[in-house]
């Protein structure tokens, strides 16, 4: 009988211990407040926001450009109509522009390449930008 109780207690402790594994880093979007032991599941994301102002919008519209496509590291992350300009740099959490989530692969930051093309496929602007985890980076398209 004593052995049965000891075995049941041991099983209970093991099962509770298994449930307390997860991401223990509060800077990660995968953070689990109940986790006691880190299991390597933390990821780190930053945001890249590509935006333009009214003057650039007017200049593009005058040349019959209707929309822009934004690529980050060669992948399309969004399109935006040229009349969707913002008055100044957009807010990190909401607002205008094309927004891309960048996984920094556990590093503090990641250097990414961006390309902005018009609706005919011509490159309007391209470059590299450093995106930090849990932060925003902005690129203004000037046309």
Residue map of PLM features:
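A short tyrosine-centered beta-strand micro-motif
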Residues: 103-119
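Tryptophan-paired
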Residues: 71-106
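Short coil-to-beta strand junction motifs in C2/discoidin
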Residues: 60-68
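Short amphipathic, basic-aromatic surface patches that mediate peripheral association
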Residues: 51-61
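Structured interaction patches on ligand/partner-binding surfaces of diverse proteins
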Residues: 115-143
């Amino acid at each position: 009988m004593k052995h049965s109780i000891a075995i049941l207690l041991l099983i209970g402790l093991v099962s509770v211990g298994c449930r307390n594994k997860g991401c223990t880093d509060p800077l990660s979007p995968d953070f689990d407040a109940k986790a006691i032991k880190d299991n390597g599941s933390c990821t780190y994301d930053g945001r890249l926001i590509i935006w333009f102002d009214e003057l650039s919008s007017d200049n593009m519209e005058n040349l019959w450009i209707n929309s822009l496509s934004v690529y980050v590291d060669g992948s399309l992350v969004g399109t935006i109509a040229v009349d969707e300009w913002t008055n100044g740099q957009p807010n990190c959490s909401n607002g205008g522009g094309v927004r891309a989530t960048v996984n920094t692969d556990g590093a503090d930051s990641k250097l990414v390449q961006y390309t902005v093309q018009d609706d005919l496929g011509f490159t309007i602007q391209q470059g590299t930008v450093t995106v930090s985890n849990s932060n925003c980076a902005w690129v203004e398209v000037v046309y």
